[in-house]
Amino acid sequence: MILGRKHLAKAGSKWLAGSSQWALSLMLILAAGMARAELVIEITQGADNPTPIAVVPFGGNGGLSENVSRIISADLDRSGLFESKSPENMLSFPSKQADIFYRDWRILGTDYLVIGDIQRSESGYVAEYGLYDVLQQKKMLGKVLSVGPTGLRDMAHKISDDVYQALTGIRGAFSTKILYIEDMGPSVKERYRLIKADADGAREQLIFKSSEPLLSPAWSNDLTQVAYVSFETSRPAIFRHNLITGKREQLTNFKGLNGAPAWSPDDSKLALVLSKDGNPEIYILDIATRALQRVTKTHSAVIDTEPNWTADGKGIIFTSNRGGNPQIYQVGLATGRVERLTFEGDYNARPRVTPDGKSLVMVHREDGVFHIAWQDIQSGDMRILTETWLDESPSIAPNGAMLLYATQHNNKGVLAAVSIDAGVKFRLPSKQGSVREPAWSPYAK
């Protein structure tokens, strides 16, 4: 855990210390009965001693369409590492360094102070902001940030990223996006929705809707495209959707299973699962030429599925029952050599590689309950991250510090998040229905 002020400098080292037949069936069952709803953050577990921080209402913030300082406070609170002071308890409201009375903040037990001022400009807004160490009475960070007329939430998330990195040594991920699938319910014709939102669930944007199930959304690394599975052709087919132009293109529609798309690091290829030749196998599709490369070759009783690229793009990590039960394997694309990676437990599936390429997260079954687990690839050491049940679809934040996953809460599907060290947890519950299949975006290039 990262605890309190004295531990923040060590944050970096401590925090960074598709579908098979069975998974497809599970996801389709769980997808039933979902309803549209906004996402609301609910922190379920934070650091034992979160660092007290005050984000003072920014000068010029009044009358703006977004409360920038409140968004920053919510971002930092959601990390679980910080506890923001309420403006109602503040003794003063400085917006520039000369106005800071450090005594006011020591009285409140505040370790760090964030202040700023927002002014309108010809092109939008300009914020000048700073981070201050209360005990040492010194400035730690000072920047000027400009955004367009609709960029106030982006401004807030960027400031949160800067503050988080300054205090933990880890790049923030508050400015990133998420994808997820939701179901409006059987009374709505086009009930299945692919949604894009900010990492905090705000600014939902409908990408695509269909009367047939949608599965496995996957971001391209340049954030301009999404690949996903749609059943609109009466069988699973893989589509790509351009987020800039809105254009959709069907990439596969082979007989049998077409599923689990995963973009290569350079976005030129998709790893995917096809059963056109019999049993489900891993293939690579060259998007420009449409050439197919078969990666795995097994007999008819074997299911190879849920591919995920290694960080260097030289291998594929995937789920297979070739050993009898679902386990995670890695295949080298140059050699074709297959290596088993998981040995603990009788069910490990849906692998996702961490950004540093050193570990992976997965769905792990223990005592008949599905949890999210982390494993060091080299040593094989595994730890269970979640205490919820029927957990699935893990997706890792681009800084490797947190992951999103789908789970059950109060008899409905929700999205939840957990830190890689399992010390921080929060939930993004739906107010009305269920949401599934999260995909956390990479960083913007």
UniProtKB/Swiss-Prot annotation:
It holds the Pfam family TolB_N. SUPFAM superfamilies: TolB, N-terminal domain (SSF52964), Tricorn protease N-terminal domain (SSF69304). The keyword Isomerase does not apply. Keywords: Cell cycle, Cell division, Periplasm, Signal. Residues 1-37 form the signal peptide. It is found in: Periplasm. GO terms for biological process: cell division; protein import. GO terms for cellular component: periplasmic space. HAMAP family: TolB (MF_00671). The Tol-Pal system is composed of five core proteins: the inner membrane proteins TolA, TolQ and TolR, the periplasmic protein TolB and the outer membrane protein Pal. They form a network linking the inner and outer membranes and the peptidoglycan layer. Belongs to the TolB family. Part of the Tol-Pal system, which plays a role in outer membrane invagination during cell division and is important for maintaining outer membrane integrity. NCBIfam families: propeller_TolB. This is Tol-Pal system protein TolB. The lineage of its organism: Bacteria, Pseudomonadati, Pseudomonadota, Gammaproteobacteria, Cellvibrionales. The gene is tolB.
